[in-house]
């Protein structure tokens, strides 16, 4: 314990945002009380890492009194909890910055939004958003932090707070560098004054901290750099625990990859494929800009999330990359421009894509799990990583009209089962499998057993058309299929006679007016009365919908309505035209057919008129009985 000096005690008031944040954390983390210990250990390890790193580049730092380690002391009777490190310590300005203000902009708003959505603030979020220290206020009423910076000329300081409106800072005598945190546990959390419980939590969350953690004289953790071990020596249990520690994920990884490279550049890496998409994909609209594996130089962490190690479409990969080919005091700018980093990135990308290919062949079910979670992200690489474009194309998987829901086909498999007459690879894009299969434009292909890829990922409409061709076969939307449907023999009912069809199509044009570009006879429909298609040079329907979502003022392109002259409804309309061309039911039926086609496409802007007209038509039909 440090001695108090005669220096005055300074009182500071938390900012309003900080008060709200403290209240939010304390009242939202009650189901995960053990998180406080994980966060305190993590902060202590970070302080030790900073001291170790700084000592290599700054000869004026105060040396540690003993081993670089974390010490925990418990008093079961008094419910006293103490955790101490010999790390970098803090100055007064650092105390105010680190313990008196919100660590990251936007943190409070983010957590409040989760609370409003009735989502629990789990331990992952606490760690990710830099507010881990404050979780200690869940298990105690008051906290004392005694610290001394390792910088030359530093003084001992004591920070105290009850987590309410204020905190105090005063000078104290402290001989050694580092930080000591002490507090009395609340009665309901007295379990954390028990040695077995503390050991349990340390092994669960902090077993691979790069510094020894002592409870009294007993070391609780296993300090080891797993990525330095040969793959043959890695134990799955250890690897999984290491992944959980570095990623703050509670689940085991789906798979992992051990990499050891010697040559123009030398490095070792241990990379992990998560079971599920990371938090950023759920809450930050897919932003992976600042993600990446941890970068170590000679076992010292340089960057926690190094975005320069992998291309953006692979930054969901967690792990550690350790090299001796960079200097320890490398800056962020040097990392970005370093030819060593560029080479490591190139090698890692090749290794990871090879890993995915291996999973697809040797563990297809595991690959399917990966693809469902991360396929949409990987596809982005088609438009950004042209060096590896061919490899990425081979990784693509699609549902199709010949697969079950949740089952996939590759482009290679598709081409292998194409019929001799088929010259193109056909796809259809939309909001989901059920909607895609209900689209009348599929009828021609399904009636002839022609497989069509079903694209339901929003990203598909941007990346798949860019492939253009595979194995000398062009990829074509079914709306753009290079098929002369008029030459195809259509079976079924006799069509409306040509001399009767012409005036009927004219009636369609009159009824729909400016809503449609043209109305023509369809040779592609089998069981539907009408369908809507784009013109030859028009944008794909799903692409048009996506563009509208991004640019709301974008004018809608007029489409062509195709009419199936063999369908009973069209034949009946022709009969009504013969009987009375001015029958108002004809216009109502035409409008209903058109809006029904829009509804199937997902493009009907309002259903009010559609439902009203449907009721009128049903009333007319029931009256005629």
UniProtKB/Swiss-Prot annotation:
Disulfide bonds: none annotated. CDD domains: HATPase_Hsp90-like. Residues 333-545 are annotated as: B. GO terms for cellular component: cytoplasm. It is found in: Cytoplasm. Residues 1-332 are annotated as: A. Pfam families: HATPase_c_3, HSP90. One of its GO terms (molecular function) is ATP-dependent protein folding chaperone. The keyword Chaperone applies. Its main location: cytoplasm. Keywords: ATP-binding, Chaperone, Cytoplasm, Nucleotide-binding, Stress response. Residues 546-625 are annotated as: C. It comes from the Bacteria. Homodimer. Belongs to the heat shock protein 90 family. Molecular chaperone. Has ATPase activity. This is Chaperone protein HtpG. The gene is htpG.
